[in-house]
Amino acid sequence: MRIRKKEVVIDSLTTSEVDLVTGVSDALAHPARLELYRYIMTENRRMNKVCTKDLVSAFDYAQATISQHMKVLVKCGLVDVKNEEKFAYYYANLGVLMKYTDAVKKYSIV
C-alpha cells in the first residue's frame, strides 16, 4: 500500500511513525546490525566511546562490512555519529528506540 506524503493516520499510526517502524525494523532485521547496536548500547551505558576500530576488534567482520552496517543504523536514526579528532564515535540514540517501541506498541494494540 502506498501512502501519500501528507500526514495520514493509518490504524492509529501516522505516516512518520510507519516510516520509523519500517526503517528501524529493516535495520535491526540483520543479525549483525542487531548485535552491533546492542554492543554500542552496552558500551555507551558503561560510558565508553565506540569507534569503528572498537567494533572491528569486538566482531569478526571486516572494517568495510562494519562501515556498511553502521551506515544503515545511522540512516534510520538508531545511532548518532560524533566526529572527534581523527575518529568517528558511535552513540546509541535511545530516543529513536523509544519512539520505535512506542509506535510498535500502538500498532499492536489496534
Language model features: what each stretch is:
Residues 1-28, 76-78:
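N-terminal leader segment of winged-helix/HTH proteins
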Residues 19-62, 84, 88-95:
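N-terminal helix-turn-helix DNA-binding core of bacterial DNA-binding proteins
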Residues 70-71:
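Short, hydrophobic-biased segments on the C-terminal half of alpha helices
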Residues 76, 80, 94-95:
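DNA-binding patch around the recognition helix
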Residues 77-79, 85-86, 101-102:
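Short, Lys/Arg-enriched C-terminal cap helix and immediately downstream tail that follows
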Residues 88-110:
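Short, Lys/Arg-rich amphipathic alpha-helical interaction segments
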